[in-house]
Amino acid sequence: EATPERLASADFSDPYYTDIPPMILVKADNAAQYATLADFDGKSVGAQAATTKETVVTDQLPGANLVSLSLVTDLVNELVYGKVDAVVLDGAVAQEYAETNPDLAIAPASSELGEAQPYCIAVAKGDPKGLLPAINEAIAKMQSENKLDDFITAANELSGKAVDVTADDSAV
């Protein structure tokens, strides 16, 4: 995501996708207890390592204990097995997990998280290799052919099905 902080160290292509705002995935039977962001104080909240979702946790859930893992599927498994209390995810990904796993839900407090940032391709600051014009041209072509929309829809659907888990330790 092209955030102001990331713009300080890299240049970015034209946006190719803007997700719905980030959401907090929790166990369905606990969802009602997370009405506000303050309800996460003292709780373990997962986020994918080296992503803007880590920043969401540290900035907007300052009383939470951040748990960073490389893979979203690992974070969701940690949630299912009770090793974390919640996971902050891209909105569409969180929705897919909640829709495909009845043991999971979106925390009501998610509405307080704010807006999503556009997804772009990062290049070295100053674009010393001159890549941005070709990248932007490719993005424009894929957008005009609806290829990006098709890819993103398929990827979001797959993200919720990548690991279909249940709390009784069985994997489907």
Residues covered by each model-derived region:
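Short helix-initiation/N-cap motifs at beta->coil->alpha
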Residues: 32-33, 67-81, 92
